[in-house]
């Protein structure tokens, strides 16, 4: 298991609310909580930036973190990430924030300490551009959306 440096920015973490942890041995994501001052109403169409009370430092340029939505919030309530996916670079050290967007038809209350997103570590491969005049021919070529087959 990879060590991940973290700072607790909200003293309720570790006291009222647990540190993020994997729910099972097969879990890929660590749940992030809404460390709000009070329960907050998110109206339909509204987007709100939610603090998590944590900052992390990955440090390894071969890793990054993704902030992803929790499936239940999106499916049951229409609460998804405003930026769809949050990318945390290995050299970022600021507070993890979650952009919540209510794409549903009814207002939703985000409770203090509610699990609102998940953090997943992923490998990173950095590339450099090699400029060419032409590409080697491929089966797909320049075919865009819908060109790899139907159903």
UniProtKB/Swiss-Prot annotation:
This is Deoxyuridine 5'-triphosphate nucleotidohydrolase. Belongs to the dUTPase family. This enzyme is involved in nucleotide metabolism: it produces dUMP, the immediate precursor of thymidine nucleotides and it decreases the intracellular concentration of dUTP so that uracil cannot be incorporated into DNA. CDD domains: trimeric_dUTPase. Its cofactor is Mg(2+). Pfam families: dUTPase. GO terms for biological process: dUMP biosynthetic process; dUTP catabolic process. The lineage of its organism: Bacteria, Pseudomonadati, Pseudomonadota, Gammaproteobacteria, Pseudomonadales. Its EC number is 3.6.1.23. Keywords: Hydrolase, Magnesium, Metal-binding, Nucleotide metabolism. GO terms for molecular function: dUTP diphosphatase activity; magnesium ion binding. Substrate binds at residues 70-72, 83, 87-89, 97. Pathway: Pyrimidine metabolism; dUMP biosynthesis; dUMP from dCTP (dUTP route): step 2/2. The keyword Metal-binding applies. It catalyses: dUTP + H2O = dUMP + diphosphate + H(+). It comes from the Bacteria. It comes from Pseudomonas syringae pv. tomato (strain ATCC BAA-871 / DC3000).
């Amino acid at each position: 298991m990879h060590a991940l440096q973290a700072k607790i920015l909200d003293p309720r973490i570790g006291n009222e609310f647990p540190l993020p942890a994997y729910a099972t041995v097969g879990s890929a994501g660590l749940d992030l909580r809404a460390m709000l001052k009070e329960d907050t109403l998110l109206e339909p169409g509204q987007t709100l930036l939610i603090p998590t009370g944590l900052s992390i430092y990955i440090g390894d340029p071969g890793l990054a973190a993704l902030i992803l939505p929790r499936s239940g919030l999106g499916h049951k309530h229409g609460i998804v990430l405003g930026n769809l996916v949050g990318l945390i670079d290995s050299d970022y050290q600021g507070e993890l924030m979650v952009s919540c967007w209510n794409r549903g038809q009814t207002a939703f209350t985000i409770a203090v300490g509610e699990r609102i997103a998940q953090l997943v570590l992923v490998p990173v491969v950095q590339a450099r551009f090699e400029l060419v005049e032409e590409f080697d021919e491929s089966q797909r070529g320049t075919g865009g959306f819908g060109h790899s087959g139907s159903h």
